[in-house]
Amino acid sequence: LFANLGIAQIEQLVESQSLSLIDKMVTKLQADGLIVHINPMQEWLQPEGDIYTHSPLDLIKILLEKCPFPIIVKEVGQGFGPESLRSLLELPLAAIDFGASGGTNFALLELLRANQTAQENLSPLAYIGHTAHEMVEMVNVLSENTANQCKHVIISGGVKTFLDGYYLTSKCKISSIYAQASSFLKLALGTYEELDAYMQIQIKGLSISKQFLRIKS
């Protein structure tokens, strides 16, 4: 169980010298660590979004120095580019969560809340990003870097089924798991039994895939 904060909130706490509040929050929640989400495009397109004044990378480094618990860094719909991935892999993070392009487009959802002029002119920006497949390829290239300290990734964003998850985790050269959100959330609106049945089918499908399928090199 991980707590969750945005990098914008981390920035505010750093500026007010109140990072100890994060430690208190994680302790009070009995969480195993903290997920920090970085979503610059979403913030820029959100009518009341927070615009970062410090480098998110610098803020994460400060957080790693001050906080004793595991930290996961994630994107929220656009994914990370190669330079961001390179820098993050070199940090002692518990994991990097892709939050790749192809899943729920939170930047677009925020833009739809803006005025008509903003929607008409800024909409192309909402579709900029990297897919999970592209990010796996980037990670594979960067995996040879001996300076890497982060050894785990969570492949998320546009993962529709167990076949997507099996393919992407098999393709990835470093330790990886995959995550799905949209399909689970849709079923979560129904009964627990429906959600559990779907989850069991996904697990079974993944097990079958691991036994019978091999990806093409």
Language model segments and positions:
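Hydrophobic faces of well-ordered beta-strands that scaffold small-molecule active sites
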Residues: L1-L5, D32, V36, I71-K74, ...
